[in-house]
From Swiss-Prot:
Growth factor that plays an essential role in the regulation of embryonic development, cell proliferation, cell migration, survival and chemotaxis. Potent mitogen for cells of mesenchymal origin. Required for normal lung alveolar septum formation during embryogenesis, normal development of the gastrointestinal tract, normal development of Leydig cells and spermatogenesis. Required for normal oligodendrocyte development and normal myelination in the spinal cord and cerebellum. Plays an important role in wound healing. Signaling is modulated by the formation of heterodimers with PDGFB. GO terms for biological process: angiogenesis; negative chemotaxis; negative regulation of phosphatidylinositol biosynthetic process; negative regulation of platelet activation; platelet-derived growth factor receptor signaling pathway; positive regulation of cell division; positive regulation of cell migration; positive regulation of cell population proliferation. One of its GO terms (molecular function) is protein homodimerization activity. This is Platelet-derived growth factor subunit A. Residues 198-211 have a biased composition (Basic residues).
């Protein structure tokens, strides 16, 4: 009975020690990662002030850790493989930037009142902000956008005859991107002069007539 109690105490102590070692990542570390430029594992290592990068455990060490005569005997019988140095390619991050994506033109942009028509071309290429940021606390979002109008063909059928009409569709292009918080709505700076003029106008205050 005393032996079982000792084993239970040892197990609880080991579990507490393991939980203490696997601490939660500090908030300041997440913030530092979110607002830093990281292009490689070496940059990440330098930013977190880590002296060395851990490697995978060798086969001999793994078998030795499990112990026992059976593991040693299996290692002796196993043919020794010819070790070849393989250069493993480092993962290239998909950074937050503008990329060409396929945009399917919504039917509501062409004619929201009808459903019996075709659009050509149905898809176009636009520049949009894509990619990942260093942490999930920030998202890749546009910081500067531009709108342009393009012509598409709207094809309808009347009395078994095709009728084609050109319709203007407004497309949004992303010019610059940034990693920012996902909750607040981004303040896009429009490229169109008309919108800048409208935003620059001051509202006139109405004077109240004395009663």
């Amino acid at each position: 009975m005393r032996t079982w109690a000792c084993l239970l105490l040892l197990g609880c102590g080991y579990l507490a020690n393991a939980l203490a070692e696997e601490a939660e990542i500090p908030r300041e570390v997440i913030e530092r990662l979110a607002h830093s430029q990281i292009h490689s594992i070496r940059d990440l290592q330098r930013l977190l002030e880590i002296d060395s990068v851990g490697a995978e455990e060798p086969l001999e060490t793994s078998l030795r850790a499990h112990g026992g005569h059976g593991a040693k005997h299996a290692l002796e019988k196993r043919p020794v493989p010819i070790r070849r140095k393989r250069s493993i390619e480092e993962a290239i991050p998909a950074v937050c930037k503008t990329r060409t994506v396929i945009y399917e033109i919504p039917r509501s942009q062409v004619d929201p009142t009808s459903a019996n028509f075709l659009i050509w071309p149905p898809c176009v290429e636009v520049k949009r902000c894509t990619g990942c940021c260093n942490t999930s606390s920030v998202k890749c979002q546009p910081s500067r956008v531009h709108h342009r109008n393009v012509k598409v063909a709207k094809v309808e059928y009347f009395r078994k005859k095709a009728k084609l009409k050109e319709v203007q569709v407004r497309l949004e292009e992303h010019l610059e991107c940034t990693c920012t918080s996902a909750s607040p709505s981004p303040d896009h700076r429009e490229e169109e002069a008309g919108r800048r003029r409208e935003s620059g106008k001051k509202r006139k205050r109405k004077r109240l007539k004395p009663t």
